[in-house]
Amino acid sequence: MADGSKVFKKTSPDGKITVYLAKRDYVDHVEFVEPVDGMIVIDPEYQKEKKVFVTMTCAFRYGRDDMELIGLSFRKDIYVQSCQVHPPLPGEKKALTPLQEKLKAKLGANAFPFSFNMATNLPCSVTLQPGPEDSGKACGVDFEVKGFWGDDVEEKVSKKNVARLIIRKVQYAPETAGAAPHAEITKQFMMSDKPLQLEASLNKEIHYHGEPIIVNVKINNSTNKIVKKIKITVEQITDVVLYSLDKYTKVVCCEEMNDTVAANSAFTKAYQVTPLLANNTEKRGLALDGKLKHGDTNLASSTTLRPGMDKEVMGILVSYKIRVNLMASRGGILGDLISSDVSVELPLILMHPKPAEGTTSAEDVVIEEFARQKLQGEQDDDEDKEEAS
């Protein structure tokens, strides 16, 4: 059966409403975002006297749950869309998508459609990795689709009457890339007539998660110093721009090479580095893609901005750079005491490749339970415990 026919569902703890979505990842193509289409099944008894709503919320969580107990709120809703699915409002009937038509045929008369179009200026899903002692929900940007019944969409409803699904807004690598990054520096040392030249480059502009990154290093050492150490690091830079100007830089890969470059000699070599979350699972605050199942998560993808987009509404911006550093010193026992560093930086774009387009099958849909997933180190909150009971 084609992958396009898989459908995810989540039922409220009271069993009265069930929300169905075709997927969990919605692609931001920079110019537009894939619509969020689904169906909600309502218990016939509730259709007689209850209103049923579906909302989609983009929220930014930047503090711990336990701080909210003393009256401090560390969650900000960036964007909220809502619709009343029952009873349907006049003039709001839309044509069903092919998948909604199949679900309607499968689920029957108690199923009602809903659809949301995301704004193009919303951030992508990003999760900040919790520390070993952290509890509650992880900080970051998330998207939630929520179905519930009540008298008004703004009404505070019991958690047992709500079906919640966390979805992701993701970006994939563009089909066309720019020039491969290149940087060079010339360093003049005291007591040396000629300089040391360091040149570094990548083979391409965009790299995929898990793919080895080739770093080409070229050294022209015309000095009387010896290059004793070559170190390549990959750094993740996370800008939290929504509520402050906080910036966090974390090393996600570090390789020290044993190669040396003698005085008055040249050196050229291509090195491989591969930044992986598997080697950084203990680093608190590391930005991850918004998948909330630890085994399925990776380092956050580089943020792609549309020209003219307001950065402040993006919540969290993620970028990467590669630093090539040389340690040059004189020979002898005391040479390292007066060593000098020479370094260059290269921008790195780290993303997922665009997957193959899914096909919509004429066969019956396959429905899969939508279980809430957690990061390693993240504990169940009260909502999850209530839903599990």
Curated annotation (Swiss-Prot):
GO terms for molecular function: G protein-coupled receptor binding. PROSITE patterns: ARRESTINS. Transmembrane segments: none annotated. Retina and pineal gland. The keyword Iron does not apply. The keyword S-adenosyl-L-methionine does not apply. Keywords: Sensory transduction, Vision. One of its GO terms (biological process) is visual perception. Belongs to the arrestin family. May play a role in an as yet undefined retina-specific signal transduction. Could bind to photoactivated-phosphorylated red/green opsins. This is Arrestin-C. The gene is arr3.
